[in-house]
Amino acid sequence: MKAIIVLLMVVTSNADRICTGITSSNSPHVVKTATQGEVNVTGVIPLTTTPTKSHFANLKGTKTRGKLCPNCLNCTDLDVALARPMCMGTIPSAKASILHEVRPVTSGCFPIMHDRTKIIQLPNLLRGYENIRLSTHNVINAERAPGGPYRLGTSGSCPNVTSRSGFFATMAWAVPRDNKTATNPLTVEVPYICTKGEDQITVWGFHSDSKTQMKNLYGDSNPQKFTSSANGVTTHYVSQIGDFPNQTEDGGLPQSGRIVVDYMVQKPGKSGTIVYQRGVLLPQKVWCASGRSKVIKGSLPLIGEADCLHEKYGGLNKSKPYYTGEHAKAIGNCPIWVKTPLKLANGTKYRPPAKLLKER
């Protein structure tokens, strides 16, 4: 019986047989795995997209601010931040803001020496707040400030709704009425006047001109000293006296003088101080700001809505979880940047089709 069984097994093993296995069509999909390197699979889902540049848009689900004051026509953001006459309007609240003025921008009314201070940063500082409003009252009585009485200087390049001459609402140009003499440093306290626990942004500065003009206006042609202090930050300045070339700002009148403008941030309940001599621009209306707004570099106008705002690509809608291309700051519901495309294998590992084998 055992011999017969062995014989049967030999006969069976020599017979033709079919080997079966997993079969599939030829696969063009290759994925790179962490453990097996490149592997052919039967199917993949792309996880990345490469965006193309588009216009900027409003961020879905939130308010987006382009210009600080959209209704202030023919006004730069610096005009609005300094409260230039004819550039005073409501700044809308926003959770996201577009930094669209990428170069230092001058403001009308008076030539500003931008390189002396951080004043060109003021519009960006304001953009970083969700809620921004200009106080209805002046922070100090400039006409009766120490060293006065003063008359408040104006510029023919700053017309307002009632007069052909004016000045920034955030500052008062303090020109001595009768006591046009040199003075030792004077100190004025700047109180906190915001009413809702906001940060108070107080703008101030000083005026410089030729020796002749300084003598005529203030009774002192020497360089003047100025200091501001608030929130633990102290800044010192010395005015520059000289014959500046006439300069015209925003189609205004030619002016030989220059102003240096700065600001200080006062926290709730905290006062600040300004120490000054002749030519001071005393603070008046202040900005009261609260909340946080995300800021991103971009351009105007804002057209439509988008899931994400990207500095290089503009408005993006999130069609894939990842993107390739230029890596830059982005805000909103944004895809994640990756260096190379990612794919999700949604099929099996590819195996060659099974073959009919004939054993001999």
Swiss-Prot record:
Q: Where is the signal peptide?
A: 1-15
* MF terms in GO: host cell surface receptor binding
The primary gene name is: HA
Question: Please, one GO biological process term?
Answer: fusion of virus membrane with host endosome membrane
Q: Which domain of life is it from?
A: Viruses
What happens to this protein after translation, modification-wise? In natural infection, inactive HA is matured into HA1 and HA2 outside the cell by one or more trypsin-like, arginine-specific endoprotease secreted by the bronchial epithelial cells. One identified protease that may be involved in this process is secreted in lungs by club cells. Palmitoylated.
| Coiled-coil features, chain-numbered ranges | none
Compartments, as annotated in UniProt: Virion membrane; Host apical cell membrane
Q: Which UniProt keywords apply?
A: Disulfide bond, Fusion of virus membrane with host endosomal membrane, Fusion of virus membrane with host membrane, Glycoprotein, Hemagglutinin, Host cell membrane, Host membrane, Host-virus interaction, Lipoprotein, Membrane, Palmitate, Signal, Transmembrane, Viral attachment to host cell, Viral envelope protein, Viral penetration into host cytoplasm, Virion, Virus entry into host cell
What Gene Ontology cellular component terms go with this record?
host cell plasma membrane; membrane; viral envelope; virion membrane
From which source organism is this entry? Influenza B virus (strain B/Hong Kong/9/1989)
RNA-binding keyword on record: no
UniProt record similarity statement: Belongs to the influenza viruses hemagglutinin family.
User: How does the record describe its quaternary structure?
Assistant: Homotrimer of disulfide-linked HA1-HA2.
Q: What is this protein called?
A: Hemagglutinin
Glycosylated residues are N40, N74, N160, N179, N246, N317, N346
Query: What exactly does this protein do?
Result: Binds to sialic acid-containing receptors on the cell surface, bringing about the attachment of the virus particle to the cell. Plays a major role in the determination of host range restriction and virulence. Class I viral fusion protein. Responsible for penetration of the virus into the cell cytoplasm by mediating the fusion of the membrane of the endocytosed virus particle with the endosomal membrane. Low pH in endosomes induce an irreversible conformational change in HA2, releasing the fusion hydrophobic peptide. Several trimers are required to form a competent fusion pore.
**Gene3D superfamilies hit by this protein:** 3.90.209.20, Hemagglutinin Chain A, Domain 2
Other notes on this protein?
Major glycoprotein, comprises over 80% of the envelope proteins present in virus particle. The extent of infection into host organism is determined by HA. Influenza viruses bud from the apical surface of polarized epithelial cells (e.g. bronchial epithelial cells) into lumen of lungs and are therefore usually pneumotropic. The reason is that HA is cleaved by tryptase clara which is restricted to lungs. However, HAs of H5 and H7 pantropic avian viruses subtypes can be cleaved by furin and subtilisin-type enzymes, allowing the virus to grow in other organs than lungs.
Keyword Transmembrane recorded: yes
Q: What is its main location?
A: virion
Q: How does it sit in the membrane?
A: Single-pass type I membrane protein
